[in-house]
Swiss-Prot record:
Catalyzes the reversible conversion of ribose-5-phosphate to ribulose 5-phosphate. This is Ribose-5-phosphate isomerase A. Its EC number is 5.3.1.6. Belongs to the ribose 5-phosphate isomerase family. SUPFAM superfamilies: D-ribose-5-phosphate isomerase (RpiA), lid domain, NagB/RpiA/CoA transferase-like. It comes from Vesicomyosocius okutanii subsp. Calyptogena okutanii (strain HA).
Length: 220
């Protein structure tokens, strides 16, 4: 089974977590795109969705799924999104596509967070995938220096990339994240950081992991 086939399978499985007649949250990225395509087959069962990026909103609308402004929504039943890495406690690194801030906001509002990924994303210690940090542009060099001094790793500005919020992304390479919650909090305390790609203080409730033998369900 190829990686795309595993993503397709977990996306189909995630439909079981979609609650009828509710508004759901939808993430951003290649696995989330598989889910959006799958969601289109049951779109009449839901009121619509809150999108975590402009790209996701466009894909939802292309499928005829109503997209809601989060400020006009009182509740989100379920948030479904992929991940760049997950540990066994369902702490995540997200934001490889640069949508981490909006993803984190929608995940915070949602009653439950279902993460969908292929088996390559499950690791014992996170950090092999560069950790994204969204920063205010004028603070980029200051934040880089603070990360080098206080966190470690190698922070680099992502070239030719601006977030939907008009900000820069710093990617921190060569990390070993042994305490995800503490690192998430510490990074967010640096002036100029909007947020970082660690989803530990609000991790996933369920991880649907695509494997060659089917979908493995891990709960927290």
């Amino acid at each position: 089974m190829t990686q795309d086939e595993m993503k397709f399978t977990v996306a189909q499985t995630a439909l079981k977590y979609v609650i009828k007649n509710t508004i759901i949250g939808v993430g951003t990225g290649s696995t989330a795109n598989f889910f959006i395509d799958a969601l289109s087959t049951i779109k009449n069962n839901i009121k619509g969705a809150v999108a975590s990026s402009k790209a996701t909103a466009q894909r939802l609308e292309n499928h005829g799924i109503r997209v809601f402004d989060l400020n006009k929504v009182t509740a989100i039943s379920t948030y479904i999104d992929g991940a760049d890495e997950s540990d066994n406690n369902l702490n995540l690194i997200k934001g490889g596509g640069g949508a981490l801030t909006r993803e984190k906001i929608v995940a915070a509002v949602a009653h439950q967070f279902i993460c969908i990924a292929d088996e390559s994303k499950l690791v014992s210690i996170m950090g092999s995938f560069p950790l994204p940090i969204e920063v205010i542009p004028m603070a980029a060099n200051y934040v880089k220096n603070q990360i080098s001094q206080k966190i470690g790793g190698i922070p680099e500005v992502r070239k030719d990339f601006i977030t939907d919020n008009g900000n820069f992304i710093l990617d921190i390479k060569d990390l070993k994240i042994t305490n995800p919650k503490a690192m998430e909090t510490k990074l967010n305390s640096i002036i100029g950081v909007v947020t970082n790609g660690l989803f530990a203080n609000r991790g996933a409730n369920v991880l649907l992991l695509g494997t060659p033998n089917g979908v493995k369900i891990i709960t927290n």
